[in-house]
Amino acid sequence: MSSSNDHVLVPMSQRNKNGLPGMSSRGARTLAEGDVLSFHHITYRVKVKSGFLVRKTAEKEILSDINGIMKPGLNAILGPTGGGKSSLLDVLAARKDPRGLSGDVLINGAPQPANFKCSSGYVVQDDVVMGTLTVRENLQFSAALRLPKAMKTHEKNERINTIIKELGLDKVADSKVGTQFTRGISGGERKRTSIGMELITDPSILFLDEPTTGLDSSTANAVLLLLKRMSKQGRTIIFSIHQPRYSIFKLFDSLTLLASGKLMFHGPAQKALEYFASAGYHCEPYNNPADFFLDVINGDSSAVMLNRGEQDHEANKTEEPSKREKPIIENLAEFYINSTIYGETKAELDQLPVAQKKKGSSAFREPVYVTSFCHQLRWIARRSFKNLLGNPQASVAQLIVTVILGLIIGALYFGLKNDPTGMQNRAGVFFFLTTNQCFTSVSAVELFVVEKKLFIHEYISGYYRVSSYFFGKLVSDLLPMRFLPSVIYTCILYFMLGLKRTVEAFFIMMFTLIMVAYTASSMALAIAAGQSVVSVATLLMTISFVFMMLFSGLLVNLRTIGPWLSWLQYFSIPRYGFTALQHNEFLGQEFCPGLNVTMNSTCVNSYTICTGNDYLINQGIDLSPWGLWRNHVALACMIIIFLTIAYLKLLFLKKYS
């Protein structure tokens, strides 16, 4: 759904002491009231492994002694690909792995507070909003988890409505954002929705990672105009950007140029051309300054070639060969350190209290939450249910397939008889049900993989705890997607097949299928948690279930397997379900009707099994009640183990880049 809203100039309203936009009685905040972010001697190194057989670890410097200050206004970080602009942005936002990081980031001269990641806003490059929800529902989710519970619902709704109006999202407020399967709002509206998610907490500092990526030039210009008006209300807006056009560049208040992790320029954006001219690089008429800066850094600009041509003869006479051969980046970095602009910045940074800078930052601690575990659990489960209903191709389709498959299997095995062929058919349908429950549970691998980026962003931003997210997703997935198919299978097949006609046996079969589905899904979660690619987790699951089928008890009699391999049967999920279903159905059944005891003994002696008990004994299944329930106990233990592994993998997942 496209909209002209991308190109509408939206006036930003004033803000009061409570930070509520559009409700001010005191007037707008001035620039002087905004937060000032300064960074001192920022150096960031990472360890890079190389080699195949012999792994060598080398240290790579991403940022090298970066100093600067970001004041209220538009602060742009510009540079070539791989220059370190996104790394610097993440460091300033306290979203970089603190290992390998040195230096200080201060807010108004003081270390970043422990809740800095929660109190500031961060808009990621790829908009991580729930596509199956509307714009308003996404904002409601952010408000419900990031605003204090003491704040009344009507106050939260008032803030949401104000932000929607501020961002020009009135016409699409109740439209779905859109997914890869369903069309939704436009790219510019999606970007503004992401910004609105962060404005819920009314942050004084807002970070954006390449906010114009994926947008056309007109929409990108509209987004930057919106950010410009927001900055005039006293916000410090810091963002990385790649090759902005001139209409966007002239909006910048401050410009930071990075290349190879070194600072090329940091100061007022409008002084950048004059600065480069003083370095000997003159921008051609009608050339975009942003493109010119990148061309100079990359050594591709005609200005660079012209400068070299004019000065080459003089340089050959006066400079040493080593200095003449220095890369442009090294020369520009050295020129900046000796420049007047750097001296002014350094003097301003030195005015900050030294004692405070040495305290260090606590911003890398765990997020500070303003809502309880139960409150977070309820909202996560609610959003997940809505997301499930918003993807009918995944939820409704699975239920329809379950009904159709159940009817087909019921027709194939319809009216099982109490004879030797009936025993074989019963074993066959039980084997199919347990293995089918396992393979259909492979879809659970998507539960954490698809939303990995969304989870990491929301967790770091202080939306919820890992435990709240984990159990909320379990409630929303295991109940409808694993419970209902098991109930449907049992209700359809039990009566079409003519299985044991007791209420107890009916519910035991249903419970067994549910336990198998839950165990297989838990295994899928344990394998997939922390993965980035669904196909890898799916492949591992499929291979695992194929091996489990071999030890389920139908394809080979488990008593005939050698002791060096027989222990693998205890790791087979289908085996426990298959054994429980057989015990539930065959115990006490007669399959040679009309035969007396003598003839029955003859049948047994000639290897014809006529009773369910004999069949169970032949399969090595204990006839006692414990022979049934120990399978469910084993499945329950496996569920606990797999879910614990999945939770720990989420808990210790690398959440910082």
Curated annotation (Swiss-Prot):
Domain commentary: The extracellular loop 3 (ECL3) is involved in binding porphyrins and transfer them to other carriers, probably albumin.
Protein induction: Down-regulated upon ischemia-reperfusion.
Cytoplasmic side: 1-395, 450-477, 528-535, 654-657
Domain called ABC transmembrane type-2: residue spans: 389-653
Gene3D superfamilies per record: P-loop containing nucleotide triphosphate hydrolases
Function: Broad substrate specificity ATP-dependent transporter of the ATP-binding cassette (ABC) family that actively extrudes a wide variety of physiological compounds, dietary toxins and xenobiotics from cells. Involved in porphyrin homeostasis, mediating the export of protoporphyrin IX (PPIX) from both mitochondria to cytosol and cytosol to extracellular space, it also functions in the cellular export of heme. Also mediates the efflux of sphingosine-1-P from cells. Acts as a urate exporter functioning in both renal and extrarenal urate excretion.
PANTHER family the record matches: ABC TRANSPORTER G FAMILY MEMBER 28, BROAD SUBSTRATE SPECIFICITY ATP-BINDING CASSETTE TRANSPORTER ABCG2
Glycan-bearing residues: 596, 600
Molecular function as annotated in GO: ABC-type xenobiotic transporter activity; amide transmembrane transporter activity; ATP binding; ATP hydrolysis activity; ATPase-coupled transmembrane transporter activity; biotin transmembrane transporter activity; cytoskeletal protein binding; efflux transmembrane transporter activity
Stretches of the chain found on the membrane's Extracellular side: 417-428, 499-506, 557-632
GO biological process annotation, one example: negative regulation of intestinal absorption
Quaternary structure annotation from Swiss-Prot or TrEMBL: Homodimer; disulfide-linked. The minimal functional unit is a homodimer, but the major oligomeric form in plasma membrane is a homotetramer with possibility of higher order oligomerization up to homododecamers.
Post-translational modification: N-glycosylated in brain capillary, kidney and small intestine but not in heart. N-glycosylated. Glycosylation-deficient ABCG2 is normally expressed and functional.
Species lineage: Eukaryota, Metazoa, Chordata, Craniata, Vertebrata
Compartments (UniProt record): Cell membrane; Apical cell membrane; Mitochondrion membrane
Species in which this protein is naturally found: Rattus norvegicus
Keyword hit for Protein transport: no
Reaction catalysis annotation: ATP + H2O + xenobioticSide 1 = ADP + phosphate + xenobioticSide 2; urate(in) + ATP + H2O = urate(out) + ADP + phosphate + H(+); indoxyl sulfate(in) + ATP + H2O = indoxyl sulfate(out) + ADP + phosphate + H(+); sphing-4-enine 1-phosphate(in) + ATP + H2O = sphing-4-enine 1-phosphate(out) + ADP + phosphate + H(+)
Stated name of the protein: Broad substrate specificity ATP-binding cassette transporter ABCG2
A cellular component term, taken from the record's GO annotations: apical plasma membrane
Cysteines engaged in disulfide bonds, as pairs: 592-610
Predominant place of localization: membrane
EC number from the UniProt entry: 7.6.2.2
Matches recorded under Pfam families: ABC2_membrane, ABC2_membrane_7, ABC_tran
Domain ABC transporter: 48-285
